[in-house]
UniProtKB/Swiss-Prot annotation:
Residues with PTM Phosphoserine: S3, S95, S355
Organism field: Pongo abelii (Sumatran orangutan)
Keyword NAD assigned: no
Gene: RBBP7
InterPro entries assigned: G-protein_beta_WD-40_rep, Histone-bd_RBBP4-like_N, WD40/YVTN_repeat-like_dom_sf, WD40_repeat_CS, WD40_repeat_dom_sf, WD40_rpt, WD_repeat_RBAP46/RBAP48/MSI1
WD repeats: 47-122, 128-173, 181-217, 228-269, 275-312, 318-370, 377-404
Location(s) in or outside the cell: Nucleus
Protein's name according to its UniProt entry: Histone-binding protein RBBP7
Glycyl lysine isopeptide (Lys-Gly) (interchain with G-Cter in SUMO2) crosslink residues: K4, K101, K155, K159
Modified residues (N6-acetyllysine): K4, K119, K159
Length: 426
């Protein structure tokens, strides 16, 4: 039995390597930017910080990323990294593919540098790290225990204490087990939601300050789910609304103004398997998406949750942890799966006619498949300052910063802007 499994693993490895070679050969035609970087340890989390600096006289801009480590029994860290991203007018020749490094392109003087700027000791791996929108120096993290930690990275030295002592600015108490979901309220400063394997969602207000030492107790604990709560997200336009999804296959909508924390305001059987992630559309107050172990992404309208608006199908394995709307385009959504693929979808193309040949590659709304990872993608983030730039991290230590070729998202035949495309609908 073991030898059969070993044989299957070897075959799969060979297929993955073959696919990667093909992907690499095609990168000059598919991308305007690809940067591949091997991290010292895998990161389970990634998020662009909103800050960007354009040094005078340079052909690049400086961007920052929040990362974490997942080590093999060594000290873990919360990491802030600095990234050089070439300007649009930087000399970039996509035909210079460096096959050994898996990188390509010459950016004039820029080689797409990625440097670790701040490392802060962390208790166990960083399951997820998210910055507070009102003050991006404040970062909340999920640990492998029940704790949620809050760090102000400006108050910590750039190099971690060699003793390994983890010294967060706040410890948030309320969960019994670990989890992944984490969401700051973009309308109410300091209000943080967290999802947990203990079947609950906790809400903290960090403005309330610690009761004892650095500990802040949960302001409310929401107990509607009957299984592991995988993800939680605040509505982006309503300060009291949030959604949660869980292994009980349900999507629940909650209102913090309600008198009850045990019953959601809306409940829907969202998928035929565990629901792993959700994301509210930043432009439309009614639209949200959920991703599931049933390999699909579902589109919902809050005005009628009985009816699923659309199902996106193309992933070959479960939508693991992440589905994110583009911060720049109302109709653009991305999802990543255990299938090592990151799919970018365009809602405005739903229902478009396509040839039989095109249909074999996927439905018309499947705009792009990023195939650069050879292991499961743990997290990804849209760059808030550079449209169409995504950073994705996978379980094999690889971090990729990439931007699909402009002719893929801009109609080649005409100079149609994205806003015009959005306006066309489906």
């Amino acid at each position: 039995m073991a030898s059969k499994e070993m044989f299957e693993d070897t075959v799969e490895e060979r297929v993955i390597n073959e696919e990667y070679k093909i992907w690499k050969k095609n990168t000059p035609f598919l991308y305007d930017l690809v940067m591949t970087h091997a991290l010292q340890w895998p990161s389970l989390t990634v998020q662009w910080l909103p800050e960007v600096t354009k040094p005078e006289g340079k052909d690049y801009a400086l961007h920052w990323l929040v990362l974490g480590t997942h080590t093999s029994d060594e000290q873990n860290h919360l990491v802030v990294a600095r990234v050089h991203i070439p300007n649009d007018d930087a000399q970039f020749d996509a035909s210079h593919c460096d096959s050994d490094k898996g990188e390509f392109g010459g950016f004039g003087s820029v080689t797409g540098k990625i440097e670790c700027e701040i490392k802060i000791n962390h208790e166990g791996e960083v399951n997820r790290a998210r910055y507070m929108p009102q003050n991006p120096h404040i970062i909340a993290t999920k640990t492998p225990s029940s704790g949620v930690l809050v760090f102000d990275y400006t108050k910590h030295p750039a190099k971690p204490d060699p003793s390994g002592e983890c010294n967060p600015d706040l410890r948030l108490r309320g969960h019994q087990k670990e989890g992944y979901g984490l969401s700051w309220n973009s309308n109410l400063s300091g209000h943080l939601l967290s999802a947990s394997d203990d079947h609950t969602v906790c809400l903290w207000d960090i403005n309330a300050g610690p009761k004892e030492g650095k500990i802040v107790d949960a302001k409310a604990v929401f107990t509607g789910h009957s299984a592991v709560v995988e993800d939680v997200a605040w509505h982006l336009l309503h300060e009291s609304l949030f959604g949660s999804v869980a292994d009980d296959q349900k999507l629940m909508m909650w209102d913090t103004r309600s008198n009850t924390t045990s019953k959601p305001s809306h409940l829907v059987d969202a998928h035929t398997a565990e629901v792993n992630c959700l994301s509210f559309n930043p432009y439309s107050e009614f639209i949200l998406a959920t991703g599931s172990a049933d390999k699909t992404v579902a589109l919902w309208d809050l005005r009628n949750l009985k009816l699923k608006l659309h199902t996106f199908e193309s992933h070959k394995d479960e939508i693991f942890q992440v589905v994110h709307w583009s911060p720049h385009n109302e109709t653009i959504l991305a999802s990543s799966g255990t299938d090592r693929r990151l799919n970018v979808w365009d809602l405005s193309k739903i229902g478009e006619e396509q040839s039989a040949e095109d249909a074999e590659d996927g439905p018309p709304e499947l705009l792009f498949i990023h195939g650069g990872h050879t292991a499961k993608i743990s997290d990804f983030s849209w760059n808030p300052n550079e449209p169409w730039v995504i950073c994705s991290v996978s379980e094999d230590n690889i971090m990729q910063i990439w931007q699909m070729a402009e002719n893929i998202y801009n109609d080649e035949e005409s100079d149609v802007t994205t806003s015009e495309l959005e306006g066309q609908g489906s």
